């Protein structure tokens, strides 16, 4: 599998990553043997970046991944995340440190390659959302101390929130990576969208991350499954999901996804899932494309799609035409 450099970290990561969250659900609620088989097969396929978080299954994802890694002892790159709860905002440094230490215990590791902030970043922070001032003034110093202690090699953000706030944090150039929501339903992180496009406008965020030499981990590549074109969800996956930056609800995302099916009829891809993965890989600023899995078959299919490479320019042009039909619709 092709690899790309994860920004200024210098890490060579596979273009397809292994998401261990609840949307796919395998590493949260799956059978232990299936979890081990999936991780082992992913490694065989050349996937070397695995992404989890303390909040996935209230730590179950980390526990399950830790158990599998202890058995397999693989050579891979691992990222996890901290979400600072509203109740702990008075002492963010302690919350950050405590979260990583608990994650390391569950993962049965002494360090991770990448530690990421999971909170949304908004100009006016509320509840568990954080302002750029708090992120830069309180979170970053705590992350730096953890790096100095050898508990993480690099640190990053989850780039969800107010566009201006995200741009500001990226432009400061202190974070090594960003998880960026980017998919065929909302391409605004990677291009300029027309006024009236029914999605959150991330304002070409990938231009800011590139300028800051940040590695980019693309998330919501399949729009939480909507880009399969079906409303049915696997029993292991989250029964309900909230879109990040796309339609008002999952059903709207599925309806719009189906309107992209001319890509298949015209021979650009075999399925919406394949097109979605290859679309994200086509952006040169994306380092790795994170997909969550429910089954081993889904993993195999995603890897085969990634190995076909980026969508060709003609497919991207046709997709832009289809996306144009969304303009003016209510979000």
In which residue ranges do the predicted regions lie?
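Acidic (Asp/Glu)-rich catalytic clusters
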Residues: 8-10, 66-76, 104-110, 169-173, ...
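Active-site mouth loops of central-metabolism enzymes
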Residues: 21-33, 82-94, 128
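Active-site groove signature of glycoside hydrolases
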Residues: 104-129
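Alpha-helix-loop-beta-strand connector modules within alpha/beta enzyme cores
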Residues: 63-80, 136-149
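Beta/alpha (TIM)-barrel catalytic core signal, keyed to glycine-rich beta->alpha loops juxtaposed to Asp/Glu
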Residues: 120-330
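N-terminal binding-site loop/beta-alpha segment at the start of enzyme catalytic domains
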Residues: 1-76
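Short, acidic/polar
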Residues: 29-42, 91-106, 161-169, 276
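Conserved, mostly hydrophobic/aromatic
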Residues: 6, 18, 50, 65, ...
């Amino acid at each position: 599998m092709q690899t790309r450099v994860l920004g200024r970290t210098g890490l060579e990561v596979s273009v397809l990553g292994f998401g261990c969250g609840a949307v796919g659900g395998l590493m949260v609620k799956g059978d232990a043997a299936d979890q081990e088989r999936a991780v082992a097969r992913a490694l065989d396929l050349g996937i070397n970046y695995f992404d989890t978080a303390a909040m996935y299954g209230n730590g179950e994802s980390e526990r399950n991944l830790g158990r599998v890694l202890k058995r397999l002892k693989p050579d891979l790159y691992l990222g996890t995340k901290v979400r600072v709860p509203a109740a702990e905002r008075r002492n963010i440094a302690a919350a950050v440190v405590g979260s990583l230490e608990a994650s390391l215990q569950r993962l049965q590791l002494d360090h991770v390659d990448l530690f990421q902030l999971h909170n949304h970043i908004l100009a006016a922070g509320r509840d568990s959302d954080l302002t750029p001032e708090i992120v830069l003034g309180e979170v970053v110093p705590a992350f730096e101390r953890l790096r100095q202690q050898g508990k993480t090699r690099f640190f990053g953000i989850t780039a969800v929130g107010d566009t201006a706030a995200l741009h500001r944090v990226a432009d400061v150039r202190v974070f090594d990576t960003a998880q960026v929501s980017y998919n065929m339903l909302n391409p605004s992180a990677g291009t300029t969208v027309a006024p009236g496009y029914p999605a959150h406008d991330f304002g070409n965020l990938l231009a800011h991350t590139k300028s800051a030499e940040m590695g980019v981990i693309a998330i919501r590549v399949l729009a939480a499954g909507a880009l399969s074109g079906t409303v049915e969800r696997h029993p292991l996956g989250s029964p309900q999901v909230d879109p990040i930056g796309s339609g008002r609800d999952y059903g709207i995302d599925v309806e719009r996804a189906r309107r992209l099916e001319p890509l298949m009829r015209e021979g650009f891809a075999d399925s919406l899932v394949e097109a979605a993965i290859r679309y994200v890989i086509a952006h040169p600023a994306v380092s790795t494309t994170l997909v969550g899995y429910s089954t081993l078959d889904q993993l195999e299919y995603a890897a085969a799609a990634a190995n076909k490479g980026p969508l060709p320019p003609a497919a991207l042009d046709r997709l832009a035409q289809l996306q144009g039909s969304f303009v003016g619709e209510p979000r």
